[in-house]
């Protein structure tokens, strides 16, 4: 190298600092590609925020629905608890506050109602295409209790048996759940 060029370099050393790269400092990308990348990142962030808001709204709606269902099933005027039988899921038992217990037996198409004092048990057949609601059944059974003049027959007498001599084996046609509910009290078929 020439001595003169060394002096020039010593007096004015070359600038080894990095070239200005803009605001975000994305190296090795042309400016059009940088803009496109920024736009894509912004769009992805907006989509993530929108999806998050929708999922949060769905979660809140589900919690609200569960809370309304829980409040309607556990209300103070008619406390209703549903317990499905584990085996085949063929019976549903409802405790209606302090008024009594209703059992739907879907396999045998029977509905049993035992009032709270537990003095008797009412049994009726149900049609599979027209299953009465719990509210309609409660009204029907309560109206039935108010009117003692309605002629009813004991289940054993209607079947041609003597009701007083009915053994526990004679109640097998009612099923386990209904037999457990109504086994110790007189049965009336409606």
From Swiss-Prot:
Pfam families according to UniProt: BRICHOS, SP_C-Propep
GO biological process, one term: respiratory gaseous exchange by respiratory system
Lipid moiety-binding residues (S-palmitoyl cysteine): 28
Disulfide bonds: 121-182
Entry's Gene Ontology cellular component terms: alveolar lamellar body; extracellular space
Propeptide: 1-23, 59-190
Compartment annotation: Secreted, Extracellular space, Surface film
Highest taxon of source: Eukaryota
Function: Pulmonary surfactant associated proteins promote alveolar stability by lowering the surface tension at the air-liquid interface in the peripheral air spaces.
InterPro entries the UniProt entry points to: BRICHOS_dom (IPR007084), SP-C (IPR001729), Surfactant_protein_propep (IPR015091)
Swiss-Prot/TrEMBL keywords: Disulfide bond, Gaseous exchange, Lipoprotein, Palmitate, Secreted, Surface film
Main location as per UniProt: secreted
Comment field (misc): Pulmonary surfactant consists of 90% lipid and 10% protein. There are 4 surfactant-associated proteins: 2 collagenous, carbohydrate-binding glycoproteins (SP-A and SP-D) and 2 small hydrophobic proteins (SP-B and SP-C).
Molecular function via GO: identical protein binding
The protein, known as: Surfactant protein C
Domain spans labelled BRICHOS: 94-190
